[in-house]
Each structure stands twice: as structure tokens, then as C-alpha cells.
């Protein structure tokens, strides 16, 4: 499970051989949220508003890299 980014209080991970659609896991000590890479839709879970804003901005800014990494790991 590669950690793609670390922030204060949470990280963004991608798991090997994970289910579709392509997504990342936004994980903190007491929360987890799955976010679709292509459109930024929240697939499941919830996180604090500050975490959500930071994660969504990072996912949007790194969408091409994330899709390439998804193809590499699946």
C-alpha cells in the first residue's frame, strides 16, 4: 500500500489490486474516506472539512499522476 502524500493528521494512500473505480484512500487516525480519482466523487466515508479541502485540492492537482499510478498498481 503506497502512501502517495502525507499531511498534518492524514495521508493519501492507494492499495494494490483494489476494486474499481480508480480511487484513493484519505486516512487519518479516526477517519477514512475513499475518493474517485477521475471526478473527485466521495465513494464512502467522511473526514473533517479541513482534511477534505486539502485532500480534494491535492487529488485534483495530481489527477494524471494518480491515474498512472492506479494503472501501475492494478
Annotate each language-model stretch with its function:
Residues 47-74:
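C-terminal structural segments of small proteins and small subunits
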Residues 3-7, 26:
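Short acidic-hydrophobic surface loop/beta-edge motif
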Residues 14-47:
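A short, structured beta-strand/loop element
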Residues 1-3, 72:
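Intrinsically disordered, low-complexity and often Lys/Arg-enriched segments
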Residues 9-13:
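Charge-dense, helix-prone N-terminal extensions
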Amino acid at each position: 500500500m503506497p502512501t502517495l502524500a502525507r499531511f498534518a493528521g492524514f495521508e493519501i494512500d492507494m492499495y494494490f489490486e483494489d476494486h474499481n473505480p480508480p480511487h484513493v484512500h484519505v486516512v487519518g487516525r479516526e477517519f477514512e474516506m475513499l475518493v474517485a480519482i477521475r471526478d473527485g466523487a466521495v465513494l464512502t466515508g467522511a473526514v473533517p472539512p479541513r482534511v477534505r479541502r486539502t485532500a480534494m485540492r491535492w487529488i485534483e492537482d495530481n489527477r494524471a499522476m494518480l491515474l498512472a499510478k492506479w494503472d501501475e498498481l492494478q
